A protein has these predicted regions:
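Short beta-strand segments within Ig-like beta-sandwich modules, predominantly Fibronectin type-III
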Residues: 511-518, 603-611
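Glycan-recognition surfaces in beta-rich domains, encompassing non-catalytic CBMs
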Residues: 40-131, 135-138, 146-147, 155, ...
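Acidic, Ser/Thr
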Residues: 491-496, 584-590
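Long non-globular sequence segments
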Residues: 2-257, 554
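Solvent-exposed segments in extracellular or luminal domains encompassing
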Residues: 520-528, 613-621
Length: 764
């Protein structure tokens, strides 16, 4: 027998992984030597859990039962049980607990009664039970049970509270506090803040068991904590050697059949420190696994994944010592972080018969997700792991995670949807089903049940949501990419990489690169021309899927300036620091022109269809205009042109007729010529490729004839509603520089004969 020890809460603080609440663990009365010895063995030794039992007091009319608020031995998981496994509580079962860390009491927490204790009927000591609930480290409890309305038979006999300390959560006393234990989320029910007097168990004779004595705790204090177990890729030991001298050793098992898909990492029973002395019977084996039933368990989402191994130990202890089963009922347990734990012993790769779905335990395996998923979706990490385990187990027996199968009912019953089952008759089931599909329960909760189609899709394949996310080394234009040759294609998929066997990069429908399923990019070298690029994913099931096609053009030919850059004077305001001009060009590309950049004397970028731009240049200064054309693939071509604007004052012209000189700071050089005499003329001679006549304009300005190289080129009207100075009003350009003459002649317009000229600008 294990020595009895009572733990009174104070002091040492432990750390457990996420963020939030300090949890103070109890101080044991063990000696330093005892503690040191247990700490040395903690990494390899199983953890023995404590179970404490207290009978509920039933009301005279049989319609309610309770357990008064009281101090308890430390526990983290609880449930209510009763004598007849076939009996039901049709009303409600609720408990409230006191936090060992804060001393605060929770609100009333419901305990699920929709389980069937007949799962392993025929065994001695099998009891009816509620679903166990994880409440975290606690040292006080109160329970109330009410029969449902119209319940004629009242409550089941032998109502009893079972509390479980899964061990492994207490830190031995040391010289200083150990560390902080951190809870990931608060409990679902808020603390009430009040703490009425609690009733010690020994002071309430009416609460003592009437149908069976409450056994004296016979477990040692929990072993010291250890880091959360890591999933192992090695097969867990099929079963541990029993620690009791009367138990027969489990024979060495041959491996189960290979699966069509990889085995996911699984934390073995040894790693979660299962107390194998609880489960001394040999496991029962099935002929195979035809279907998987998904469950939820522990009735809370407010747990830290660092506590998951302790929760599994608590479930194991509860199923054996409270339900009276031979072992943990589920074949696999998954926490919200996606860690998979080995459940019932016998070998994870063997078809071990569990105790999870009454009437359909044969030919099936049970996977339970720790949490409550009635209204809350299970985490993606959890559903991913459920899908991986289901695919692996079904793959051992050529099952289809997306398919259906006939299962023979092992007992009369019904499911949540109202379908009835008759023992010995076969019924169709999805090969991944929820507990509610085989039994009248909400399990695995409406939200998790609604996630089963997505779980089937993950497990069965193919890879979904496959798209090309990027083409590095190429430039996109619309839906087409352009590259010189080398690219790296990146992709993404909604299916997690753990289900992907591999990816292939296809060019023109042929693979050019093959990578593993956790790789999301691959390089390729393309020949010149247009190519269709895709990614093909192979699911672990062997099913394939293709991404949409991406068009990639490989192009090594540079763009061409079909029209070289050229400069021409334009109309506008002229000053001694800026002469208006136009820069013209035309660039083309065999594939796709991206842009043309002006790099000097200023930086500008123009679109592929732009062929001219307005600029200014400083007079009397040679300026180089440099341009580079870029295509979509990154090929380039450069071209340039140089020009010098020159201002010829009116005094540089050959005069004809009558002209007067006008002075003003508004004129180029401070002076201009004006004439109202018909036929008066000015002639400039220059060598250049563009010319612009500069004038002053006003409402009274008249007209002039313009002659170029002796030929009349235009009649120009200088009239303007607003007075303007230094206006280039007329321009003329040639393809190359040459000697030219420009002559202006006063028309003598009626009513406004005068005109004022401010010189000529030419470009050389």
């Amino acid at each position: 027998m294990r020595a009895q020890r009572r733990v009174w809460a104070t002091a040492a603080v432990t750390t457990a992984a996420v963020a939030g609440v300090l949890v103070f663990q109890g101080v044991t009365g063990a000696s330093d030597a005892d503690r040191d010895g247990r700490a040395a063995d903690a990494k390899s030794a199983p953890v023995e859990a404590d179970v404490h039992k207290a009978a509920l007091k039933t009301s005279p009319d049989g319609g309610s039962a309770s357990l008064a608020r009281r101090d308890t031995e430390p526990f983290s998981l609880l449930g209510v049980t009763w004598t007849d496994p076939a009996a039901k509580v049709t009303g409600s079962v609720e408990a409230r607990t006191r936090s060992a860390a804060t001393g605060a009491w929770t609100g009333w927490l419901p305990l699920d009664t929709e389980i069937d204790g007949r799962t392993e009927t025929g065994r001695s000591g099998v009891r009816g039970t509620t679903e166990p609930r994880w409440v975290g480290p606690s040292n006080g409890v109160e329970v109330r049970v009410r029969a449902g309305d119209g319940a004629r038979s009242g409550l089941p006999a032998g109502l009893r509270l079972d509390t479980v300390d899964p061990g492994g959560t207490s830190t031995p006393l040391a010289a200083e506090p150990a560390a902080f234990a951190v809870e990931e989320t608060p409990t679902e029910e808020p603390a009430t803040g009040d703490e009425p007097p609690v009733t010690p168990p020994t002071e309430d004779p009416a609460e003592e068991p009437t149908d069976e004595p409450a056994p004296t705790p016979t477990t040692e204090s929990p072993a010291p904590p250890s880091p959360p177990p890591s999933p192992s890729t090695e097969p867990p030991t099929p079963s541990a050697t029993p620690t009791t001298p009367t138990a027969a050793p489990t024979p060495t098992l041959t491996p189960g059949p290979p699966s069509t898909v990889p085995r996911p990492p699984i934390v073995s029973r040894a790693d979660w420190k299962a107390d194998e002395s609880l489960s001394t019977e040999a496991p029962d084996y099935l002929d195979g696994v035809k279907a998987v039933f998904v469950h939820h368990t522990a009735q809370t989402n407010a747990y830290s994944c660092a506590d998951s191994a302790a929760i599994v130990r608590g479930l194991h202890t509860y199923h054996v010592k409270s339900n009276g089963w031979k072992d943990l009922g589920y074949n696999f347990i998954v926490d919200k972080c996606g860690t998979v734990f080995e459940g019932r012993k016998g070998g994870v790769d063997r078809p071990v018969m569990g105790a999870h779905t009454y009437g359909f335990n044969r030919d099936t395996t049970g996977i339970a997700v720790i949490g409550m998923y009635t209204d809350t979706k299970a985490a993606t990490a959890a559903t991913t792991s459920v899908a991986r385990v289901a695919a692996w187990k079904l793959g051992q027996y050529q099952g289809d995670p997306a398919g259906s199968v006939q299962l023979t009912a092992g007992a009369n019953g019904g499911n949540f949807a109202g379908q009835s089952f008759v023992a010995g008759k076969a019924y169709p089931f999805r090969q991944i089903s929820g507990h509610r599909d085989g039994f009248n329960t909400q399990c695995p909760g409406g939200s998790l049940h609604a996630q089963l189609p997505a779980i089937r899709s993950l497990a069965a394949g193919p890879v979904t949501g496959l798209t090309i996310a990027s083409v590095t080394g190429a430039n996109a234009s619309g839906s087409t990419y352009y590259t010189r040759s080398k690219i790296t294609v990146g992709w993404k998929a909604t299916t997690p990489s753990s289900f992907v066997k591999g990816y292939e990069l296809l060019v023109g429908g042929k693979p050019v690169a093959t990578v593993k399923g956790n790789v999301t990019s691959a390089p390729a070298t393309l020949a010149a021309g247009k190519h269709s690029v895709q990614v093909r994913a192979t699911h672990q099931s062997g099913k394939t899927s293709l991404s949409p096609v991406a068009t990639v053009v490989a192009d090594t030919a540079p763009p061409v300036f079909s029209t070289k850059p050229a400069l021409a004077l334009r109309t506008g305001t002229v000053s001694t620091s800026a002469v208006p001009l136009t820069l013209r060009w035309k660039a083309t590309d065999a594939a796709s022109l991206k842009e043309v950049r002006l790099t000097a004397p200023v930086a500008k970028t123009y679109g592929p269809t732009t062929s001219s731009a307005s600029h200014t240049a400083k007079p009397a200064k040679a300026t180089a205009w440099k341009m580079t054309a870029y295509d979509r693939a990154g090929n380039t071509a450069a071209a340039s042109v140089s020009g010098t604007p020159v201002i010829l004052q009116e005094s540089a012209a050959k005069k004809g007729g009558k002209w007067t000189t006008k002075s003003s700071g508004s004129y180029l050089g401070g002076k201009s010529y004006s004439s109202s005499t018909k036929g008066s003329s000015l002639t400039w001679t220059f060598t250049g490729r563009s010319a612009a006549w500069v004038v002053s304009r006003a409402a009274t300005s008249g007209q002039a004839y313009v002659y170029v190289d002796g030929k009349k080129a235009a009649t120009v009207d200088l009239k303007s509603s607003a007075t303007k100075y230094r206006q280039a009003i007329w321009t003329k350009s040639w393809s190359a520089g040459a000697k030219h003459t420009v002559k202006i002649v006063v028309v003598g317009t009626k009513g406004r004969p005068a005109l004022t000229t401010d010189g000529l600008v030419y470009l050389k």
